[in-house]
Design a protein with these regions (language model features):
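Conserved SAM-binding strand-loop segment of SAM-dependent methyltransferases
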Residues: 124-139
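A short glycine-rich, Lys/Arg-flanked "PGG" loop and its adjoining helix->strand segment in the class I
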Residues: 163-178
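Conserved SAM/SAH-binding beta-strand->alpha-helix loop
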Residues: 113-115
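Conserved SAM-binding loop of SAM-dependent methyltransferases across substrates and taxa
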Residues: 93-104
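Short, glycine-/aromatic-enriched active-site segment of Class I SAM-dependent methyltransferases
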Residues: 179-204, 208-211
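Conserved class I S-adenosyl-L-methionine
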Residues: 82-92
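A conserved beta-strand element that flanks and buttresses the S-adenosyl-L-methionine
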Residues: 148-151
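N-terminal juxtadomain amphipathic helix
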Residues: 1-62, 226
Length: 239
């Protein structure tokens, strides 16, 4: 699916009159015939998105309600330890971590966006400003130990280094650790013509058909899947 050349979706232009050269990039979606994974064929350096990332989770009231419901639900299901510990990959400004913190969890966020992470730290959310990777996971393991819950909401769409991300996730898991992933549901993207969700920051579009074998290759077994309406249609995968 060739959508031509477009500028970056979240690249804000300066005030009128300032000189600004806006780059454009190919926006082409392809599907692998072997594994059925759907992704962009041209990848943009992620520093162009995250160095001056404008999005803060806290500004979205709908997201706040969803985070409140999610934290309460996951606390009931998986908050069985006396020392519950959450690691959130793609934690942004710490809004979801803060919900768990109020429930008595120890929390750690990891996110590459400087301004949201700075906000999280200023508001008492332990956070690492970096792209999550196997090397970051090793450092977390040494300093913090194993969590009993890992959350990655809308993270997998934003990276073309999924294998290293999952190597890192595996390092932080044992038999008692639960991983919860949220992804925009690729089936709904194409079934409902959600073309506005296709832009350079979203490198991948996931379906269960493609993601289940991928998870299985890391020995990760899915035991529950929820479908909900966020972002035009999403799925939450419990592993």
């Amino acid at each position: 699916l060739d959508l031509g050349k477009t500028p970056l979706a979240n690249e804000l232009q300066p005030a009128r009159g300032a000189k600004f050269k806006q780059e454009i990039f190919d926006l082409i979606v392809g599907k692998c015939d072997d594994c059925m994974h759907i992704q962009l064929l041209t990848m943009v350096n992620p520093s162009k998105f995250f160095k001056n990332y404008p999005y803060f989770s806290k500004i979205n009231s709908t997201t706040d309600v969803r985070f409140q419901n999610l934290s309460s639900s996951l606390d009931r299901r998986y908050g069985e330890r006396n020392d519950n510990f959450l690691i959130e990959i793609g934690s942004n400004d710490g809004s979801l971590c803060a919900k768990f913190l109020s429930l008595g969890w120890r929390v750690l966020g990891v996110d590459p966006a400087e301004s949201p992470v700075r906000y999280a730290l200023e508001n008492g959310i332990d956070s690492i400003c970096d792209y999550f990777s196997s090397s970051v996971a090793e450092n977390i393991l040494d300093k913090y130990g194993l969590p009993n819950l890992i959350i990655a909401n809308n993270v997998l769409a934003h990276s073309d280094h999924l294998r290293d991300i999952f190597l890192g996730i595996k390092l932080l898991m044992n038999n008692q650790t639960v991983l919860v992933l949220e992804v925009s549901y690729g089936l709904k993207v194409f079934e409902n013509f959600l073309f506005d969700t296709i832009y350079h920051e979203h490198t991948s579009y996931h379906t269960l058909f493609s993601i289940l074998p991928f998870l299985d290759s890391y020995g990760l077994k899915v035991f529950d899947v929820e479908q909900f309406d966020a972002h035009g249609g999403s799925i939450r995968i419990h592993i």
